[in-house]
Every structure is written in structure tokens, then in C-alpha cells.
């Protein structure tokens, strides 16, 4: 074949977005098992609900833990795909915050699965969840700034950046925040990454490569 062919390469943005969306959906499905327990105010009623649905509850916590652990992987891949510069630095910082915070929530989910009474009555220290939430909010702030410097559409970065102070105010005021809001924003970012049309990469044909002195497999 003569001339040049345009290839899309490895599509790193789209692959990163796929991981983020799939992991966020996994988290959402898992956390929805016995989902009404999160809206139930009475501890005794929460415990009774969990005891009636112990199997689905435990399975849901494992699914949510898998999603929690996998979401940061997608953002690590996104950061790796960016060219060196401020956007990459900010995205790397966001990914690092997510990686640091994920184990805290995974441990909390494992605790929920193993001790129904403790979760129903909201016993135990609050610092792991507060730290996880704080890291997540910091990650969204850095991610939003990084996205605004990336080739993606501006609304993606604006959404992430604007959510950070809003979520921070909620967390500071109530000492609590539903984690699904984090994954909703991140899934939206992932969906935009999946839709991003990455520039085609020109590839030299055999004759061109020979003239340029490039090696062939």
C-alpha cells in the first residue's frame, strides 16, 4: 500500500473513560442493593432491613468496593495519556488523591458487610469517611482545573471544578455527604472521555519508512 494511513492509535482517553464509567456503574449497582437503608433514619429499622437482606447487602458492598478501587485506575490512565504540562500535573494530582482515598472507603464497605449492627447504629470513627470525602473533593477540584486545560469540551472541567466547593460546603456543614455525588460527576467525565474523538495519527507506509530509515518488524 502506498501513501499514508490515518490510525486512531490506542485511544487512551476513550479507554480511560470506559474504565471510569464501568467502575462508577459497578459502584452504583452495588450501593443500590438494599438501597432504602441509606434513607432510613431509625437505627433499629435499618438493622432489621439489613438482617432481612443480608446476602444482597454483602454482595452489594463487594460490588461497591470493586467500583471504588477501579475508578482511580481510569483517572490514572487519563493522566498518563496527557502531554506534559499543567493539565497533566493537575490530573496526576487528582488521580493520586483518588488512589489515596479509595482504600479508606473499601475498608468501610468491608466493615459494613461484616458488622450489620455497627453500620445500622452508625458506630465507629468518622475520620476514615471524612478523609476519603475530603480527598475526593480535592481530586475533583484538581481534575476540573486539569480538564479545563485539556482538549475536552469546557463543560466537563467546569462541572468537576464547580462541584468541588459545593461538595466541600456540604461536607463542612453536615460532616456527611452521599458518595454517589462524587461518582455521578466522575461518570459524566468518563462519558465525555469515551466520546472524545482523538486525533488520527499519520503512519508512514513501507516505502516512506524505508526512506526515513525506520525499522520494520
Enumerate the predicted regions with their spans.
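Hydrophobic, aromatic-enriched alpha-helical segments typical of multi-pass transmembrane helices
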Residues: 2-217
